[in-house]
Amino acid sequence: MKNRERGNPHADSGRGAGTPTPAPRARGGAGEPRPAPVLSVVVPTYNERDSLPQLVSGLAEASQALALELIIVDDASPDGTGTLAEEMAKSAPLRMVVIHRPGKAGLASAVLAGAGAAQSGVVTVMDSDLSHPPELLPALFEAIQGGADVAIASRYVPRGGVDQWPWARRLVSRVATTAARVGLGLRVRDPLSGFFAVRREILTERGYRGLGYKLLVEILARHPQARVAEIPYRFVDRRQGRSKLSYGEIWAFLRLLVTLKVGKLESWRVGKLKM
């Protein structure tokens, strides 16, 4: 894979069960129907009630330049995030869909569930905690329109970076990124980014395990010929709520790396036997 490469990721559904609830038919000014979305923004949520209003506000502003829809995938948040999302969907200035799942089933499977409800041909994945700037959405979309299959908001290319992280978290991130790149033979600089855009058909095909909280690395590992663009951005640590990252998520990520590595070795062996 080369930088600015493009690709073809394919997916299963490790989707958790969920019931999508769309907002009433959205209309623009003067009562005109809104244009069909060209970009679907999938946002997994769990206890993000405090962040949600600012997220919707930021996406509404971005939707002035780009026809967006927002798909919230809520894992039965005890703080009422899903209920608040339903209420906001009734008057949101952009199309808004809320998918309710019965419990925590992981961020990766939430993204797959959201992609299944998307109406546009391009899906963007971002956090609900305001760490991912909505103003970068046009650049990600333009990269896909320009021929990329995957467009990554990258912390580890020139002009990218991370703000407000303690040294220990920076170290963990770098070690995990290096493990993914070296272990799976990935050439992109930030295969663990949680902020990326991808062609919808890539996420709705079968085959993904949907384990843990990092779906992008599985996309890249399964589709080494993917055409990928990396767009620099600075990750600003979340300003609302608490981090989703847990020891369980880290363990799921390590299991995923091992599973993907074994899968690549098996594919290589099968290829050699056929020669």
Task: Describe these PLM feature segments.
Residues 1-10, 15-36, 181-186, 208-275:
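Hydrophobic helical membrane-anchoring modules
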Residues 38-40, 69:
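Cell-envelope/extracellular polymer assembly enzymes that use nucleotide-activated donors
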Residues 50-54, 79-88:
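Acidic helix N-cap motif at the loop->helix transition within catalytic regions
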Residues 57-67:
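Short, acidic, metal-binding catalytic loop of nucleotide-sugar glycosyltransferases
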Residues 69, 83-117:
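Conserved donor nucleotide-binding strand/loop of the catalytic core
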Residues 74-83, 103, 130:
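A conserved acidic beta->alpha catalytic loop
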Residues 101-117, 122, 134-213, 238-248, ...:
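Acceptor/aglycone-binding surface of glycosyltransferases and processive sugar-polymer synthases
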